[in-house]
């Protein structure tokens, strides 16, 4: 029995994930209960189920396959919401397992250069800080490059993370050339023996052509120092944007060689299912997911835990 004077035990990440995805889960659970309670599995039921999955942002292609899986061999039979939830969790986990991939730092590439892209508002700069915290905790020497030179707040934010993680920060006044800054950062990392360079970039959606050409320029300039760099290019996505995340991946993928995704703001959104649609359409590794403001709220992606949390399976 716990003493009332004691602090409650801290929530596990799964508990935080489950709590964060509660709005996504509630919408899906309500739909399943409404569709499968005291009804036999016929064409109409399956069509409603498929529509519910699409409304939950799981994507049309995956929804069709999943509806087929539930219908398989069960025509005119009754199936409980519990059974459907278990099938749903198993199929989502199976599909997401293919994109569950930790961010690996290749120590033979020093510095290991990570370019981080994403539109304004996704939490990109904060995500860079959290990744820096994780890497420094693992013993890596990290250098941060404040490449979002269009936002003074982003530069200041990265400087704060530099202090928190005891990492060097390369920054220039707002409006400076981002590609030149990235070049200087990689050069400085070589001189100081940094293991990893994390490069922030601008995310101005209102000037997409300029944004994309700037990203291309950063990649070109970095390659002058190391033809194999950047060694990882991550796209940070905001879960609350739902289907819009698909077009963001398309746009960035056409410009830079994306190697992985980070999904933020899964807490408090009803659109958590979009991660399933992204994985199904693009198959890009998902390195991290975020469910809150604290550094510990960004964790490596766990397909089974995510599938269980999304479907409300304990």
Residue map of PLM features:
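Non-catalytic terminal/linker segments enriched in charged/polar, low-complexity residues
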Residues: 1-102, 108-116, 133, 137, ...
């Amino acid at each position: 029995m716990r003493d009332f004077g004691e602090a409650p035990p801290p929530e596990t990440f799964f508990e935080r994930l489950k709590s964060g995805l509660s709005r996504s889960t509630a919408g899906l659970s309500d739909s399943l209960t409404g569709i499968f309670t005291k009804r036999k599995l016929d064409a109409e039921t399956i069509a409603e189920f498929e529509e519910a999955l699409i409304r939950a942002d799981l994507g049309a292609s995956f929804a069709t396959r999943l509806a087929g899986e539930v219908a398989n061999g069960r025509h005119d039979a009754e199936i409980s919401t519990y059974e459907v939830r278990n099938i749903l969790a198993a199929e989502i986990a199976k599909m997401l397992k293919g994109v569950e991939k930790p961010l690996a730092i290749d120590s033979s590439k020093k510095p290991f250069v990570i370019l981080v892209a994403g539109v304004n508002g996704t939490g990109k700069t904060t995500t860079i800080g959290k990744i820096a915290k994780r890497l420094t905790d693992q013993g890596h020497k990290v250098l941060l490059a404040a490449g979002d030179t269009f936002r003074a707040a982003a530069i200041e934010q990265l400087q704060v993370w530099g202090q928190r993680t005891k990492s060097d920060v390369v920054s220039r006044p707002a409006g400076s050339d981002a590609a030149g800054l990235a070049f200087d950062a990689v050069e400085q990392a070589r001189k100081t023996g940094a293991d990893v360079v994390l490069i922030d970039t601008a995310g101005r959606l209102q000037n997409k052509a300029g944004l994309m050409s700037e990203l291309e320029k950063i990649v070109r300039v970095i390659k002058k120092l190391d033809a194999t760099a950047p060694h990882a290019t991550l796209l940070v996505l905001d879960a609350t944007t739902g289907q819009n995340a698909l077009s963001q991946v398309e746009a960035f993928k056409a410009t830079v060689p994306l190697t992985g995704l980070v999904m933020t703001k899964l807490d408090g959104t009803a659109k958590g299912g979009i991660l399933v649609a992204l994985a199904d359409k693009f198959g890009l590794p998902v390195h991290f997911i975020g469910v809150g403001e604290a550094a510990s709220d960004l964790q490596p992606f766990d397909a089974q835990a995510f599938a269980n949390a999304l479907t409300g399976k304990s």
